[in-house]
Amino acid sequence: MVVKRKLNCGGSNGFDFPNIPKAPRSSRRKVSGKRSDDESEICAIDLLASLAGKLLEESESSSTSTYASEADNLDHLGGLIKQELEDGYTTKPCKSEFFDPGNPASKSTSENTSVTCLPFSSFENDCILEQTPVSDCKRASGLKSLVGSITEETCVVNEDAGSEQGANTFSLKDPSQLHSQSPESVLLDGDVKLAPCTDQVPNDSFKGYRNHSKLVCRDDDENYCKYYKFSDKCKSYRPLSRVGNRRIMQSVRAISKLKCFEDTRTDGRLKALYRKRKLCYGYNPWKRETIHRKRRLSDKGLVVNYDGGLSSESVSNSPEKGESENGDFSAAKIGLLSKDSRVKFSIKSLRIPELVIEVPETATVGLLKRTVKEAVTALLGGGIRIGVLVQGKKVRDDNNTLSQTGLSCRENLGNLGFTLEPGLETLPVPLCSETPVLSLPTDSTKLSERSAASPALETGIPLPPQDEDYLINLGNSVENNDELVPHLSDIPADEQPSSDSRALVPVLALESDALALVPVNEKPKRTELSQRRTRRPFSVTEVEALVSAVEEVGTGRWRDVKLRSFENASHRTYVDLKDKWKTLVHTASISPQQRRGEPVPQELLDRVLGAHRYWTQHQMKQNGKHQVATTMVVEAGSSM
């Protein structure tokens, strides 16, 4: 197939530029490697170079009045090109034209633009982008050039074959304008001459506008995390390659995959752009450079430190340097997965044992303060213990961990409470009186004491504290009540407190020498209260002793049974003996299959039944005799 150009003369100004093939709509996608055999033919490079030179000379010397005649000459030259190409078809190769949308020169509509192909020397040769200025006749034909601040950029590329240096000079605005302006509004003066380069793209001068973002290809199995980087820079277009050099291109692709993180080749030349074509295709130019992670990191305890690079422990936000992002967290709000999990809480109040205060009515406030201070000092200085309450229940085992108890940073710590308890070796020394007084300090650092009146103080019976301790609530303290206030009726008018003070309990007049310290028994432990009720089954020996005592004494004298057979057994009460006898009677009256508990010999059960019948009948006789005697007494009284 021969490269053909069609020059159409006409239009509003009498001249039309040659049609330049446009890039396909799917240029962002991967260019198919299949091409027809017609496109792989080689053209006569020398002939095209000479014709291009003639066209350039004619275009420079032409004017707007001679455009029509030059159009006819171009048709003649087009036919001549076709004829000469057919003659040199089998001798020299020719590279097909292509359109590079990433090159601004391909977007211009300059007249008589032609493509020249030089003999292929090596697949390592880089392309040359060369532009030469043309006359201003094109601007008279209605075209517009770039307006604004223009910067000049020069790129020189070395050739291996001819050792030639080509200066690539062009004018360029902001690269974002290249996407917004149409080909009719963008003009870059000059013709373009391209050298054959199957591995390169003829826009090496646009290196500053390519996508050179590195994508880390390492992928760990433990932490699969990738990111995509979008770019708003100019997209590059890879031209179609020749069929004859497909093997060379495949070898270059294999080499480029190994050097995907390098910017230049080892020999110092520019790197082929198609190595990064996957970075350029498929992304919209208006998207910002953003990192999108495929996996969302959880904020419930998982902390990842970013130290650059992509691995199972880090993610880099930049191709060159990673930024560190340390995760901070609070142990009181989120659950931690580390072994150093800590539970943080604040103690607003403590429960203290009950303090009963006794003061005479004639005592001064200073004496009352000293008395309370001595009581509190005796409590705190004598040794105290700390109690822990979880959901209102006291935790008694000190060896349990916080997680076993139900306390962790993930749980609500509002269910946690503490109490102050007197030590085992000391007893609280409160002050007791017939009319105790309740003190409510307003300062948050002071303790509050609770008083309770009890008639047991007069008889000398020790006053046990209440079962429930009282919580010190800072918000419920009485304002302006820093001191204990006696009853207003017993205080002189000049010494009466202000109206906002409140008398809690009236204090009766007592002599000053009546002040005394009465120790109050320590609150009995639950274990001691329930120790007697612990189930202690009767042994066979105890059952035999019980049966013998009942046979002698009877079933109505359990205290005598206790003194006769269980005098030294302090854990056996007469009530226990009575309950056990009833159980034995019931066990003996049922079948052996229905019996539960420890087995009792059948001989003892028979004795139980015999004793039970005997004493039942004896009791009935006693009741009958008593009724007869009562009847006789009543009749004798009535006869009188």
Swiss-Prot record:
Residues 442-464 are annotated as: Disordered. Induction: By salt stress. The keyword Hydrolase does not apply. Disruption phenotype: Viable, but deregulation of telomere length control. Residues 530-589 form the HTH myb-type domain. One of its GO terms (biological process) is telomere maintenance. Residues 343-422 form the Ubiquitin-like domain. InterPro entries: Homeodomain-like_sf, Myb_dom, SANT/Myb, TRP_plant, Ubiquitin-like_dom. Keywords: DNA-binding, Nucleus, Transcription, Transcription regulation. One of its GO terms (molecular function) is double-stranded telomeric DNA binding. GO terms for cellular component: chromosome, telomeric region; nucleus. Residues 558-585 bind DNA. PROSITE patterns: HTH_MYB, UBIQUITIN_2. Its main location: nucleus. Expressed ubiquitously. Highest expression in flowers and roots. Pfam families: Ubiquitin_TPR1. It is found in: Nucleus. It comes from the Eukaryota. Homomultimer. Interacts with SNL1 (via PAH2). Interacts with STO. The Myb-extension domain (593-622) is critical for telomere binding. Binds specifically to the plant telomeric double-stranded DNA sequences 5'-TTTAGGG-3'. At least 2 repeats of telomeric sequences are required for binding. Induces DNA bending. This is Telomere repeat-binding protein 4. It comes from Arabidopsis thaliana (Mouse-ear cress). The gene is TRP4.
